[in-house]
């Protein structure tokens, strides 16, 4: 009631003509390069004089200190004329339909749009010359439109029953023209409005002395037509290829020249069980390249599946971690026959999965797992559930042992413990939304900086950023940052920017939420404390492109540049995913100091990768033979029992017999063969033939 009273008082002031304007101000720059100002009724706006401001101050006092539209447009306004539509233009049912404080704040701002000196431009365009009778809104800035939709859609029933893209298709400004809000907004959290050049003319003409910071960054659309891209990583081999993961089970290569290879680098879509509904986290989860990938060709993949051998048991699906090796002949394709299963975790639910894989500077593989929404009752009542849930695992994959895929680092906190699995490095996580390793940590006391986004177990509506430290329990451990998200979207972890192009972003941890809001964390060099700051991204008026859609993940290339992966729909089958790169508009896209020499990807050249064909080789270069093979590089076949009468074992349990002998081990004499007196010569020929056949089998 108090808010409505304040608006009525303002309308009364308009009707009685309390405000007097100077028509010359609104007409001053009509012929100049400044943006043409017109109110909704076609008249120029008026300048506020001192007595007008006193009246506004009195109205603010009557409203209990609420800032009215005079606070948004303190110098020039269209609410000073008796024939102005004023605030009543937008006084319909939606502005009193919510008790949500955040939504109310946005509605109060939108109510003041008719008072803007650019109100005619905000409400009328050639494509939209008639106002909608049910919901009369100005043309909103794209990020503001999304913020309004996601904040208010649950509090204004019946009016916003649509998607964010459809809503903003009509109510967001599509061209480079002015959009609402056209006044500086104080941001408690979240990005500032994504416009860089739209306030400049207004401040110059209006005589506003406040300093407006033009420190926004931009996004450059790199690739479109992707299917639910969830991550983008590099191999660290000098080729500067970017490997894009699609949720359905594909990994694609983007070259430094911007070409997307037609043939996928990895295709396991027949193994991957992916979810098609929003909130279903199943699918291809993560990819990490071995630090020595250039020599050993090893990579590690995590995905969800449901194979037959797990068909019986207390689970919905299986989270699996697998080692693959790149093809010996084609460096742009994985040999799927080299798959070695590292880890399998039974999951009951389709959320809180985690599955992030990454290598630390210590060379160990880190696996970040969510709690899978598993309760203590689930753990007690059902056998077969993993003890790894909600944990960070640390494994040593550089092992020469052929019977186990990894070893346990002796520095793991539970190496000799009986209470925790020795693989566990830290635990107490709930819903890790992506983690990243800082490649250049600034704190000399910490040689490993892993930052993760996570939900708060005690209060699921809040989120937190964690710094993963050895042996910590994050059920009780304080987080780096804990806050209530500025929208209802879950957090999506990003990367610590260590690139070259956007120098202003250097050292900042870039992350966001699912609904397209971006934040950064910066560590103070003095206090070592992490401070939260909004990340401002410019709109199309100041940048070559703008961000749209939901954030699915972040990526990092070999130079340390950060990428954003998005999609406007949650269906995995749709090709509307995009890849964006964060760039600084004040610097060239590729400054001279950022240029590096690209090394074309080459096939593996090590002896083990070329000769170990009847087995697999470990990341350290040891050839582990498949059953039935032995010797150096597994080139000697084994026959058990051994071949008799001079027969040669050419394949596992396959003997090539001399003439005159039969049977699996050449143990039988062939009675039908005529004996030849020169048996010695024939035996030599048979021996030579056996050798040639054996050699041919190796070559094949």
Curated annotation (Swiss-Prot):
Topology versus the membrane: Peripheral membrane protein
Signal peptide: 1-17
The UniProt record lists the keyword Glycoprotein: yes
Keyword field: Cell membrane, Disulfide bond, EGF-like domain, Glycoprotein, Membrane, Metal-binding, Repeat, Secreted, Signal, Zinc
Residue ranges of domain EGF-like in the record: 607-634, 635-667
Glycosylation sites: 99, 416, 447, 459
InterPro entries assigned to the protein according to its UniProt record, in alphabetical order: 6-blade_b-propeller_TolB-like (IPR011042), EGF-like_dom (IPR000742), EGF_extracell (IPR013111), Folate_rcpt-like (IPR018143), Glc/Sorbosone_DH (IPR012938), Quinoprot_gluc/sorb_DH_b-prop (IPR011041)
Binding of Zn(2+), residues: 383
GO molecular function: hedgehog family protein binding; zinc ion binding
Residues covered by region (Interaction with SHH zinc binding site): 376-388
GO biological process, one term: negative regulation of signal transduction
GO CC terms of this entry: cell surface; extracellular region; plasma membrane
Principal location class: membrane
Gene3D superfamilies registered for this protein in UniProt: Laminin, TolB, C-terminal domain
Source superkingdom: Eukaryota
A Pfam family matched in the record: GSDH
Entry keyword annotation includes Membrane: yes
Summary of the tissues where the protein is detected: In the adult brain, high expression found in the ventral cochlear nucleus, medial habenula, indusium griseum and tenia tecta. Some expression also in the caudate putamen, the nucleus accumbens, the ventral pallidum and in the superficial layers of the superior colliculus.
Subcellular localization: Cell membrane; Secreted
Positions of disulphide bridges: 216-536, 218-543, 402-624, 435-452, 500-594, 612-623, 625-634, 639-649, 643-655, 657-666
Notes concerning its domains: A flexible loop interacts with the SHH zinc binding site and contributes to zinc binding.
Subunit details: Interacts with all three hedgehog family members, SHH, IHH and DHH.
Family assignment from sequence similarity: Belongs to the HHIP family.
Job description of the protein: Modulates hedgehog signaling in several cell types, including brain and lung through direct interaction with members of the hedgehog family. Soluble forms inhibit Shh-induced differentiation in the fibroblast cell line C3H/10T1/2.
Protein's name in the database: Hedgehog-interacting protein
């Amino acid at each position: 009631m108090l808010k409505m009273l304040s608006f009525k008082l303002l309308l009364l002031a308009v009707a009685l003509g309390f405000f007097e304007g100077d028509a010359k101000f609104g007409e001053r720059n009509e012929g100049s390069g400044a943006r043409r100002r017109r109110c909704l009724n076609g008249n120029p706006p008026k300048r506020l004089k001192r007595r007008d401001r006193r009246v506004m101050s009195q109205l603010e006092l009557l409203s209990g200190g609420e800032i009215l539209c005079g606070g948004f447009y303190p110098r020039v306004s269209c609410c000073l004329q008796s024939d102005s539509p004023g605030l009543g233009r937008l006084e319909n049912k939606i502005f009193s339909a919510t008790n949500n404080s955040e939504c109310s704040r946005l509605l109060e701002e939108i109510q003041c749009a008719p008072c803007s000196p650019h109100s005619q431009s905000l409400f009328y365009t050639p494509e939209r010359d008639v106002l909608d009778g049910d919901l009369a809104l100005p043309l909103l800035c794209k990020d503001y439109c999304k913020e309004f939709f996601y904040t208010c859609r649950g509090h204004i029933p019946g009016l916003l029953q649509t998607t964010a893209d459809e809503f903003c298709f009509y109510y967001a400004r599509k061209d480079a023209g002015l959009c609402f809000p056209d006044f500086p907004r104080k941001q408690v959290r979240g990005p500032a409005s994504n416009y860089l050049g739209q306030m400049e003319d207004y401040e110059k003409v209006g005589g506003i002395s406040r300093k407006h910071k033009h420190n926004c960054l931009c996004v450059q659309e790199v690739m479109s037509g992707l299917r639910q891209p969830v991550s983008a990583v590099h191999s660290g081999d000098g080729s500067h290829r970017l490997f894009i993961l699609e949720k359905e089970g594909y990994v694609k290569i983007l070259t430094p020249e911007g070409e997307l290879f037609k043939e996928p680098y990895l295709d396991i879509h027949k193994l991957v069980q992916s979810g098609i509904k929003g909130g279903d986290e199943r699918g291809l989860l993560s990819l990490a390249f071995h630090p020595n990938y250039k020599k050993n060709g090893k990579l590690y993949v995590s995905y969800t599946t449901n194979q037959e051998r797990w068909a019986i048991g207390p689970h919905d699906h299986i989270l699996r971690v697998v080692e693959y090796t790149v093809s010996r002949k084609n460096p742009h394709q994985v040999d799927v026959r080299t798959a070695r299963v590292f880890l399998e975790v039974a999951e009951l639910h389709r959320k809180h999965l985690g599955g992030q894989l990454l290598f630390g500077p210590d060379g160990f593989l880190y696996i970040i797992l969510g709690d899978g929404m598993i309760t203590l009752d689930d753990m007690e009542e059902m056998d077969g559930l993993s003890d790894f849930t909600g944990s960070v695992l640390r494994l040593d994959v550089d092992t020469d042992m052929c019977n186990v895929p990894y070893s346990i680092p002796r520095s793991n906190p539970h190496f000799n413990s009986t209470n925790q699995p020795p693989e566990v490095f830290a635990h107490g996580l709930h819903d890790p939304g992506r983690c990243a390793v800082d490649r250049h940590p600034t704190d000399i006391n910490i040689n490993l900086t892993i930052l993760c986004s996570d939900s708060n177990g005690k209060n699921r509506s809040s989120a937190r950023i964690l710094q993963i430290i050895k042996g910590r329990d994050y059920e009780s451990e304080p987080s780096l940052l804990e806050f209530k998200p500025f929208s209802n979207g879950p957090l999506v972890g990003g990367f610590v920017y260590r690139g070259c192009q956007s120098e202003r972003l250097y050292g900042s941890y870039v992350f966001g939420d699912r609904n397209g809001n971006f934040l950064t964390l910066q560590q103070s060099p003095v206090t070592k404390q992490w401070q939260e700051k909004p990340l401002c991204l410019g709109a199309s008026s100041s940048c070559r492109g703008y961000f749209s859609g939901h954030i699915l993940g972040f990526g990092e290339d070999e130079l340390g540049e950060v990428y954003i992966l998005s999609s406007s729909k949650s269906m995995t089958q749709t090709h509307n995913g995009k890849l964006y790169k964060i760039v600084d508009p004040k610097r060239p896209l590729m400054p001279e100091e950022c240029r590096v020499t690209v090394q074309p990807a080459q096939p593996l050249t090590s002896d083990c990768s070329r000769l170990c064909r009847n087995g697999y080789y470990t990341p350290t270069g040891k050839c582990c033979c498949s059953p039935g093979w032995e010797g150096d590089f597994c080139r000697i076949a084994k026959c058990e029992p051994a071949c008799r009468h001079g027969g040669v074992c050419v394949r596992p349990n396959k003997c090539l017999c001399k003439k005159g002998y039969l049977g699996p081990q050449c143990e039988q004499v062939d009675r039908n063969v005529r004996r030849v007196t020169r048996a010695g010569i024939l035996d030599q020929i048979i021996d030579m033939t056996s050798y040639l056949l054996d050699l041919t089998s190796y070559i094949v």
